[in-house]
Structure formats: C-alpha cells, structure tokens
C-alpha cells in the first residue's frame, strides 16, 4: 500500500543544511529504511501568480526534466512529494565536487581531474543532444555518489532551447561561472553558456580556488578580460550589440600556460576551446569529448578510486552549515516568519 505524504516524509532523517537559494533549500538526509544518504531539495511554493494548481512552475519544470532525462551522469529522482507549503525532491548523493575541491588534504591528480570533467561533459552532451540547457553549472551542483560517479544536479534553471527567436533571461548561472554573453545581457543564447561554466569548473579543479571570482557583473567581466584578454568585434562578432554591452580597456591577457603551469598542451587546448569568447565557436560537449586530452594517458581515474572527502572536512562543512542555519533561524525570528516545526 502506498504511503501517504506525511509517512513518506518521516522516512527520512534530516542530517545537515546544505544550502539555500531563492526558490529552494537543500538538506542532507538519511533514508531510515536503507540507511542511504540522500539530498532533499525543498522547493517553496510561490504565490498564486507564480504557481499552477498550487505548484511552483520551477518545481514542475525540474520534476518533469528529472523524469524525462536518463543518463548515468545525471541525477535520478528517487521521490517527489508535497507537504504543507513545500515540494520535496529526493536524490541519491554522498558529496559534491565543491567539497572535494575545498578539501586540501586531498591530492587531485591529473587522472582525477580528467575523470570529473569527462563525466561532466558526458552528462552535458546528453542534455544538449536532448535540447536542454542546464544554466546553473557549478561545483556544488555536481554530485558524487558512493561509487564516485559524478551526476549533474539542480535543474531548477534548466530550459529547453532550439527556437532561433526564443528569448531567455540572462540572470542565470552563478556569477563566477557565468559566460561573458550573459554578463553582457544576452537574451538569446545556447549551449555555450554551459560550456563556459565547464571551463570555469575545470580551472577551479586545477587551481583549487575559483578561477574568476567577481563581486559584481562588471567586476566579473573585468577579471575575465584581465586574465584572458579583451575581445574585439573581430574575435567576437556582435559583442557590441548585446543589451548591456560596455566597452573595456584592451587588456592583453595572460597566456593560459602561465596561469595553469602544470597543464599539458592537450589540456590547454581544451581550456582555450571552453574559454572562447565567441559563443558560436566555443567548444561544444561533443567536440570536447573528441579532443586528444581524453584519449591520451593518464586515463581517467575509475569512480571507486576517486578521492573521498576527509571526515574532518565534512565535519567542518557541517559546522559552517550549522552556523548558516542558526543565522537563517535568527533572521526568521526577527522577521516573525519562523515556523514552530521544520518539516520536509
């Protein structure tokens, strides 16, 4: 007999607060029946003007995509249920790439990095072949299961593409991973926005810190151009026609081999393709997977042999998240919006 919503919610023990966005809060939890670790994404139901039949459109889109997409490197939806003013989506998870990158006790070998990027591109190629943009790729949206398999997650901003005249919002992708065309306000774009984000994630894996971490769109563009050089109409046709375009000083940029001194020629070729300013000629997922970088030694590390987060690092992250959770509760009390009991 199928369990009712309240009984399904009680199957999971909440362990840790992982993060919060504009539309959702994510928790780490344990399935009491199987003892497996899951991620629970609680999507807030919006106002009537933002909802359809009481369900937030973002939630509907994410549930629909997770049900339609089936690939080893895309997160699977275990369950979805509504309770009070939230919709909960459940997915398997052990950790995410951000935890791995920040754990300085771990050594990321060239083979490890190749494995992470290979799995990211395989999942992305599948999405793009099915005419779906992710639009929010970043390390903590790349989950890793207990077998070391990387899975693209968080499809709250994912969108179908393909219509040549379709207009989208440019306020997508976390700023540090946002492509220049988005920073210049482009309303029509394609797979290039995801590919730039992959380049930024690859750079972060190599450097162990975010490659370009601007605190505003203008600051982000300045950092990009200082590092990679300022594009021109010759290198990026149509750039000056973008809605929020502003002219920049002509920075010469720094050769990528000086920024990523340990990278070989094949890896530098991939980075250059991902960091191409003209989105029309930026390397696609399918093109990237055919590059020599993935066919030469070392081969990608098998999933079970990839590094696992240090328990002390996980504990530190849990402590940080606990402090964030306390601040959220304090803010809620001050605003008079704290619920008596937090439920799934």
Curated annotation (Swiss-Prot):
Phosphorylation of Ser-163 during mitosis inactivates the enzyme. Phosphorylation of Thr-169 is required for activity. Phosphorylated at Ser-163 and Thr-169 by CDK2. SMART domains: S_TKc. One of its GO terms (biological process) is transcription initiation at RNA polymerase II promoter. Residues 12-294 form the Protein kinase domain. Keywords: ATP-binding, Cell cycle, Cell division, Kinase, Meiosis, Nucleotide-binding, Nucleus, Phosphoprotein, Serine/threonine-protein kinase, Transferase. PROSITE patterns: PROTEIN_KINASE_ATP (PS00107), PROTEIN_KINASE_DOM (PS50011), PROTEIN_KINASE_ST (PS00108). ATP binds at residues 18-26, 41. GO terms for cellular component: cytoplasm; transcription factor TFIIK complex. Its EC number is 2.7.11.22, 2.7.11.23. The modification Phosphoserine is found at residue 163. Probably associates with cyclin-H (ccnh) and mat1 to form a multimeric active enzyme. Serine/threonine kinase involved in cell cycle control and in RNA polymerase II-mediated RNA transcription. Cyclin-dependent kinases (CDKs) are activated by the binding to a cyclin and mediate the progression through the cell cycle. Each different complex controls a specific transition between 2 subsequent phases in the cell cycle. Required for both activation and complex formation of cdk1/cyclin-B during G2-M transition, and for activation of cdk2/cyclins during G1-S transition (but not complex formation). cdk7 is the catalytic subunit of the CDK-activating kinase (CAK) complex. Belongs to the protein kinase superfamily. CMGC Ser/Thr protein kinase family. CDC2/CDKX subfamily. PANTHER family: CELL DIVISION PROTEIN KINASE, CYCLIN-DEPENDENT KINASE 7. This is Cyclin-dependent kinase 7. The lineage of its organism: Eukaryota, Metazoa, Chordata, Craniata, Vertebrata. The gene is cdk7.
């Amino acid at each position: 007999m199928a369990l009712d919503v309240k009984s399904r919610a009680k199957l999971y023990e909440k362990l840790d607060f992982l993060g919060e966005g504009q539309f959702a809060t994510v928790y780490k939890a344990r399935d009491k029946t199987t003892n497996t670790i899951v991620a629970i994404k609680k999507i807030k139901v919006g106002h009537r003007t933002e909802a359809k039949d009481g369900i937030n459109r973002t939630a509907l889109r994410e549930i629909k995509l997770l049900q339609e997409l089936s690939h080893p490197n895309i997160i699977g939806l275990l369950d979805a249920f509504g309770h009070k003013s939230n919709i909960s989506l459940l997915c398997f998870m052990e950790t995410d790439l951000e935890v791995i990158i920040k754990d300085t006790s771990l050594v990321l070998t060239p083979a490890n990095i190749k494995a992470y990027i290979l799995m990211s591109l395989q999942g992305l190629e599948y999405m793009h072949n099915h005419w779906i943009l992710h639009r929010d790729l970043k390390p903590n949206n790349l989950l890793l299961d207990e077998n070391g398999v990387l899975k693209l997650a968080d499809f709250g901003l994912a969108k179908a593409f393909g219509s040549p005249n379709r207009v989208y919002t440019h306020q997508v992708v976390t700023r540090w991973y946002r492509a220049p065309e988005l920073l210049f306000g482009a309303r029509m774009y394609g797979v290039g926005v995801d590919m730039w984000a992959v380049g930024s994630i690859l750079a972060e894996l190599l450097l162990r810190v975010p490659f370009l971490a601007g605190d505003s769109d203008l600051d982000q563009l300045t950092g990009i151009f200082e590092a990679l050089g300022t594009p021109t109409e010759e290198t990026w046709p149509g750039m000056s026609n973008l809605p929020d375009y502003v002219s920049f000083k002509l920075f010469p940029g720094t050769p990528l081999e000086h920024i990523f001194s340990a990278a070989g020629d094949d890896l530098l070729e991939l980075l250059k393709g991902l960091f191409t300013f003209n989105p029309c000629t930026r390397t696609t997922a399918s093109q990237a997977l055919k590059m020599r970088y993935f066919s030469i030694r070392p081969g990608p590390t098998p999933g079970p042999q990839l590094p696992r987060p240090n328990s002390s690092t996980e504990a530190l992250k849990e402590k940080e998240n606990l402090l964030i959770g306390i601040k959220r509760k304090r803010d809620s009390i001050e605003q008079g919006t704290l619920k008596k009991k937090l439920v799934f």
